[in-house]
């Protein structure tokens, strides 16, 4: 996706942002109930220490969520090398305005993406540019969105549509077409299931 952090020029407060609301509603709808149940809830209790130390940061109200954006501190912890922070926006994101530095004809390149931490000014939010460098942008700018979540690795994934697709493909390859078809029928309109049946 390619979205603004906020719909209007206002303070970059993650819990109150339009982008957070989109993740909790529209993005949530992309998951089946079984998939959503396997996403572990997390309490985001961002403090001033989670933001870029070169900018003024304040503590945020703790909030429980399932899907979120990484904070500045999390990026430094999990993606310490600038090269690791580069991400190529999807065709969907590019069609909605995501910046793309590279070769669009072959889909190789990088895209800017939001972090949930405040930026340098009160109406700015932190982001990573196409080089993987930390920057600050006005909250009304449209940038790439890279959702983050914590999965419960002990969850039974057999009910996940992707796992069911894999099982159906294996059954079809073994010649058990009736069982494969029955499994695909349970997937309904899940994206990609029709292509697998061909």
Task: Pin down the residues of each PLM region.
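Short, charge-rich amphipathic alpha-helical segments embedded
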Residues: 177, 181-198
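Charged/polar, solvent-exposed surface patches and flexible loops
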Residues: 21, 25, 29, 170, ...
């Amino acid at each position: 996706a390619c979205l603004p952090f906020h719909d209007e020029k206002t303070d970059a407060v993650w819990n109150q942002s339009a982008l957070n609301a989109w993740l909790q509603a529209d993005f949530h709808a992309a998951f089946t109930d079984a998939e959503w149940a396997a996403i572990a809830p997390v309490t985001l209790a961002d403090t001033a220490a989670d933001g870029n130390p070169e900018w003024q940061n304040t503590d945020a109200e703790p909030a429980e969520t399932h899907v979120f954006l990484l904070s500045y501190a999390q990026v430094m912890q999990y993606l310490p090398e600038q090269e690791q922070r580069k991400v190529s926006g999807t065709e969907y994101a590019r069609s909605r305005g995501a910046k793309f530095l590279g070769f669009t004809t072959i889909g190789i390149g990088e895209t800017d993406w939001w972090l949930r931490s405040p930026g340098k000014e009160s109406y700015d939010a932190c982001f990573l540019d196409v080089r993987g460098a930390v920057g600050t942008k006005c909250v009304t700018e449209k940038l790439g969105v890279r959702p983050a979540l914590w999965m419960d690795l002990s969850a039974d994934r057999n009910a996940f549509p992707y796992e069911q697709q894999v099982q159906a493909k294996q059954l079809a390859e073994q010649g058990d077409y009736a069982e494969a078809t029955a499994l695909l029928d349970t997937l309904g309109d899940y994206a990609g299931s029709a292509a697998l049946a061909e």
